[in-house]
């Protein structure tokens, strides 16, 4: 959890927002996936949001569902994902690493064992996409026992009660949804979120990162101008992977220029 605090303090000093890319671990295969993650970090990513392949990712649009399918086709298992996470942490000791999960994967070996394994490999946060705040007690309690930040989603239509709960239970960062629905670069997020961000700050919530539909540098600078601590981009990055499956080096080159431009926009 301290890695998030350190990151946001440093970015604050530099008057920058965070740019956080999302990819699915093991897409399109373990070796290339590790190269992709190194490229994201080397190109300026401030933190990572990583998915573990899951057969039925409800909150995700077709782009990220396809990433899951590619990782499955490559035979990637949750155990291998944890091995990858250990390698990433060893190579990049300071970057915050967040997991985006579904509850079934957490339940598989028992909730406590899951968070213990996260702690062991150096994961900083876990967002369980299909567990609402009111059902989150066993997850967030296990997370905190193992020094893992429980991450909560703040939807654009959140009422005051939900904002208070998210602020009270969340650590690390708050995942601020640009809009309702499934993830995807084609569904551009454009709701006025500054009022939600102000409320979250008033209730001392963890810093808000805006996600869902973030696919251009302009959207990153708009999120930061609205008061968010930064932005998360997933589908736009996964599309670059999908488009360049036949040319791995081209894939890394395109990821490099995309992430550099998105990060540059967080300084605007």
Curated annotation (Swiss-Prot):
GO terms for molecular function: tryptophan synthase activity. The active site is at 49 (proton acceptor), 60 (proton acceptor). It catalyses: (1S,2R)-1-C-(indol-3-yl)glycerol 3-phosphate + L-serine = D-glyceraldehyde 3-phosphate + L-tryptophan + H2O. Pathway: Amino-acid biosynthesis; L-tryptophan biosynthesis; L-tryptophan from chorismate: step 5/5. GO terms for cellular component: cytosol. It comes from the Bacteria. Its EC number is 4.2.1.20. Keywords: Amino-acid biosynthesis, Aromatic amino acid biosynthesis, Lyase, Tryptophan biosynthesis. The alpha subunit is responsible for the aldol cleavage of indoleglycerol phosphate to indole and glyceraldehyde 3-phosphate. Belongs to the TrpA family. Tetramer of two alpha and two beta chains. PANTHER family: TRYPTOPHAN SYNTHASE ALPHA CHAIN, CHLOROPLASTIC, TRYPTOPHAN SYNTHASE, ALPHA CHAIN. This is Tryptophan synthase alpha chain.
